[in-house]
């Protein structure tokens, strides 16, 4: 069964299958799964048969460290399903751990989050993969609406609220009023794009090759959107692109911020564009209510202050 814009409180299980992380919420228990959206597989034969050997955190630890015949897969890209089979296996694995081996869903109603910018075909794919994993009924919920409900915004009121949902693959800006999305702008850059910017900067400035896990560590440790009172440094280990040998460099937060700035500016422009297209009466509400940031990318140092200064909210 395929439905849209549901009453979220009628559903016992909520699933957010993100590009970077998969989160499962149960009404009676809260968040019960928060794992990386990664699957590790081993090739069995030349016909393409695969054996799944790890999910989530265990699989993420293998990224960049696998021998021949084993690879890590991210089943989602830019907020949508890229590998239907692996997505199904991943959801089934997490739900089996919750409900007991060999059982299907204990609860028939499951709400699954998707970016509001995805197509109807992409929404249907999310529902189909959830049903294939064992759900009796599945509906899709736009991520900005789910985020708004999660933080306690009364979305059914005649009042404008802006939610900026910044995950790993997409950044989505939604103006919400009367239970619906009035304006929606999205750009397929977010946390992963920040990591890629760091990887590119390290290659260009230091001829140093690093992996995505190292880039993420740099972003978390010394990344920022605005200058800091006390700038930070950290030692980064990688492979020298010139001679192929191990190499250690000292990296400053200033360099990282410069690398991240184009991506942050693109997100900022997306928010500005959405606000510019918002009806005047709702803009008045935004001045009073401010803008809500959600998603892992929102944790970048100084990001909320930068957006506040740039957008006068």
Where does each model-flagged region fall?
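Acidic, divalent-metal-coordinating active-site segment for phosphoryl/phosphodiester hydrolysis
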Residues: 171
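Nucleotide/phosphate-binding catalytic cleft detector across ATP-hydrolyzing
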Residues: 1-166, 174-291, 298-313
């Amino acid at each position: 069964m395929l439905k849209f814009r549901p009453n979220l409180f009628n559903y016992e299980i909520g699933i957010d299958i993100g590009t970077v992380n998969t989160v499962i919420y149960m009404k009676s228990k809260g968040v019960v799964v928060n794992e990386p959206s990664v699957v590790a597989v081993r090739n069995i034969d030349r016909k393409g048969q695969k054996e799944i050997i790890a999910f989530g955190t265990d699989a993420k630890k293998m990224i960049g460290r696998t021998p021949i015949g084993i690879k890590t897969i991210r089943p989602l890209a830019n907020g949508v399903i890229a590998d239907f089979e692996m997505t199904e296996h991943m959801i089934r694995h997490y739900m089996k751990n919750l409900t007991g081996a060999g059982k299907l869903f204990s609860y028939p109603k499951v709400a699954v989050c998707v970016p509001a910018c995805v197509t109807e075909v992409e929404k249907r794919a999310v529902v189909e993969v959830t049903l294939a994993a064992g759900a009796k009924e599945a509906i899709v919920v736009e991520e900005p609406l789910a985020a708004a409900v999660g933080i306690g915004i009364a979305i059914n009121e005649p009042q404008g609220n802006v939610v900026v949902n910044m995950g790993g693959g997409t950044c989505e800006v939604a103006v919400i009023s009367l239970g619906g999305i009035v304006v929606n702008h999205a750009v397929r850059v977010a946390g992963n794009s920040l990591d890629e910017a760091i990887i590119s900067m390290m290659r260009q400035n230091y001829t140093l090759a690093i992996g995505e896990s190292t880039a993420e560590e740099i972003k978390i440790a010394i990344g920022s959107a605005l200058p800091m009172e006390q700038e930070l440094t950290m030692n980064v280990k990688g492979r020298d692109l010139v001679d192929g040998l191990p190499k250690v460099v000292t990296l400053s937060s200033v360099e990282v911020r410069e690398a991240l700035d184009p991506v942050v500016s693109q997100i900022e422009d997306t928010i500005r564009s959405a606000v510019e297209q918002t009806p005047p009466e709702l803009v008045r509400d935004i001045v009073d209510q401010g803008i809500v940031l959600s998603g892992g990318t929102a944790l970048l140092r100084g990001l909320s202050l930068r957006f506040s200064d740039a957008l006068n909210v």
